[in-house]
Amino acid sequence: MDVDRLQEALKDFEKRGKKDVSPELDQFLCHVAKTGETVVQWPQFKEYFLFKLEKVMDDFRTSAPEQRGPPNPNVEYIPFDEMKQRILKIVASFNGTPFTIQRLCELLTDPRRNYTGTDKFLRGVEKNIMVVSCVYPSSEKNTSPSLNRMNGVMFPSNSQSYTDRSNVNGPGTPRPTNRPKFTLSSPMNTNGLPDSMENKESDLQQKEKSLSDSAVFDDGSQATTPKNKHSAEDSVEAEEHEVKRLKFDTEEDEEAACANPDASSEVSTEMAEEAECASTSADKGKESCQTAQTADEESLMTASESTEVECNERDSETVSVSEESSEESHQMEESEQSESACSLNSEEPNSAAAAASTAGTDSSEGNIGIKSTEILSLSPMENSEEATNAPEEPMEQD
């Protein structure tokens, strides 16, 4: 559409008194009806639009008289002249191009396309002019930086230049905000659906099962080492308990022998037997310690070292006890010899008892290993003092 020719046609229309139809301006209205683009501003073609609208309404009434019969009770009846003046007044109040300009131009160029009655045609026109939004011509987008609108009316001002926006809801419609795209955090299957909860539960069960198996294996490996330790400690404690019991028994027997010197021979034999049993048990204890040591060398070094130390201490105790018992037996032998000498001078039965006691002491000398206490070491010393004091009495009798 040539803008220069259009402006010349508008000037000619004004010169002719705004009463004649211009083919060029009718062609302009057809162009707007097809494309919706207004090449010129609204004030320039507003007068011709009003002239064309009034002419079409008059022609429509002459060609199609008003409807006969009673009017529609659901619609307010308005006379033609009143409706015509109302429509022309609303259009004349526009200071900007209404955004329904394309539909209005269609009604002006081809009024009988959709309507046959005058009343319906007027209501269709009224519906399209009851708007407030405006549109801008294509030329105004680039050449008119000082336009403003308020309630569908354009006012010249120092506003910013027009920016391209959609005319569906009219100019000035706020633009939609750009919403961020959210991605699914859950994994997707091949068909595009997220994984089901059953798969997640099965994975969790497998993980828990593997963790429990590893924990049981660790507990079993840790439980084997304390078992070996406890078994070795139990054997050592049993041996120590047995040795203490034998030691306590020997102490009681020796005390009884001191009280009854006639039964010393029997006690000495019993002590010898118990000493042999103790020695055999000690040997067995050593062997068990050695076997436990060889079995637990790799896994339990601490347990084997403790058993070795205890065995060495036990050996040293047995050696010290044997030395003490040898000294005590030597002292007892001397005291018994002195007693035998005194008894020979006094009475023969006493010499026989002394000989029996010396025989018992000789047998006790061969069996070393009896454990004694400090009480036994004190009793022979008292006997020796009595023996030294006994020979003095026969000398006085002589």
Curated annotation (Swiss-Prot):
Residues 197-211 have a biased composition (Basic and acidic residues). Pfam families: PPP4R2. GO terms for cellular component: cytoplasm; nucleus; protein phosphatase 4 complex. Residues 139-149, 156-170, 183-193, 278-294 have a biased composition (Polar residues). It comes from the Eukaryota. GO terms for molecular function: protein phosphatase regulator activity. InterPro entries: PPP4R2. Residues 138-398 are annotated as: Disordered. Residues 338-366 have a biased composition (Low complexity). Serine/threonine-protein phosphatase 4 (PP4) occurs in different assemblies of the catalytic and one or more regulatory subunits. Regulatory subunit of serine/threonine-protein phosphatase 4 (PP4). Belongs to the PPP4R2 family. This is Serine/threonine-protein phosphatase 4 regulatory subunit 2-B. It comes from Xenopus laevis (African clawed frog).
